[in-house]
Amino acid sequence: MPRRREVPKRDILPDPKFGNVEVSKFVNAIMQSGKKSVAERIVYGAFDIITTKGGKDPLEVFSAAMSNVKPMVEVKSRRVGGANYQVPVEVRPARRAALAMRWLRESARKRSEKSMGQRLAAEMLEAAENRGGAVKKRDEVHRMAEANKAFAHFRF
């Protein structure tokens, strides 16, 4: 690793519609090839679908989905004496949010609805109710950590 000064964290501006930093980060997570306006259209379209379909506040659904998908622990590979162990470690808050966004995005992409906005809305509504592909992924990661609890003393 370089021994230069530590790079400062960049402040992310809140999104223009809701004034929320988390939504802005999610738009950036959805974005492909720098096409931010397309990503915004997808996310805001999904929020509109949530409003019409569920009759709920899209920000509440989004935050509920995020909190249900965020992992508490994950496993990291650690080499000890010629053997690789999957060591359970706690997830940092910033990484929790990043993983939750990534899992929401990937499980939305795997869905069968017509547009990405519809897929994203359906995935967020399901995640808010503790079901769906992203929640399944979180449970899988938690199960792996639980199964390898015996190696927790190898923590980094």
UniProtKB/Swiss-Prot annotation:
<dbReference type="GO" id="GO:0019843">
    <property type="term" value="F:rRNA binding"/>
</dbReference>
<dbReference type="GO" id="GO:0000049">
    <property type="term" value="F:tRNA binding"/>
</dbReference>
<dbReference type="GO" id="GO:0015935">
    <property type="term" value="C:small ribosomal subunit"/>
</dbReference>
<dbReference type="InterPro" id="IPR000235">
    <property type="entry name" value="Ribosomal_uS7"/>
</dbReference>
<dbReference type="InterPro" id="IPR005717">
    <property type="entry name" value="Ribosomal_uS7_bac/org-type"/>
</dbReference>
<comment type="similarity">
    <text>Belongs to the universal ribosomal protein uS7 family.</text>
</comment>
<keyword id="KW-0820">tRNA-binding</keyword>
<dbReference type="InterPro" id="IPR020606">
    <property type="entry name" value="Ribosomal_uS7_CS"/>
</dbReference>
<dbReference type="GO" id="GO:0006412">
    <property type="term" value="P:translation"/>
</dbReference>
<dbReference type="InterPro" id="IPR023798">
    <property type="entry name" value="Ribosomal_uS7_dom"/>
</dbReference>
<dbReference type="Pfam" id="PF00177">
    <property type="entry name" value="Ribosomal_S7"/>
</dbReference>
<keyword id="KW-0687">Ribonucleoprotein</keyword>
<keyword id="KW-0699">rRNA-binding</keyword>
<comment type="function">
    <text>One of the primary rRNA binding proteins, it binds directly to 16S rRNA where it nucleates assembly of the head domain of the 30S subunit. Is located at the subunit interface close to the decoding center, probably blocks exit of the E-site tRNA.</text>
</comment>
<comment type="subunit">
    <text>Part of the 30S ribosomal subunit. Contacts proteins S9 and S11.</text>
</comment>
<protein>
    <recommendedName>
        <fullName>Small ribosomal subunit protein uS7</fullName>
    </recommendedName>
</protein>
<dbReference type="GO" id="GO:0003735">
    <property type="term" value="F:structural constituent of ribosome"/>
</dbReference>
<keyword id="KW-0694">RNA-binding</keyword>
<dbReference type="InterPro" id="IPR036823">
    <property type="entry name" value="Ribosomal_uS7_dom_sf"/>
</dbReference>
<keyword id="KW-0689">Ribosomal protein</keyword>
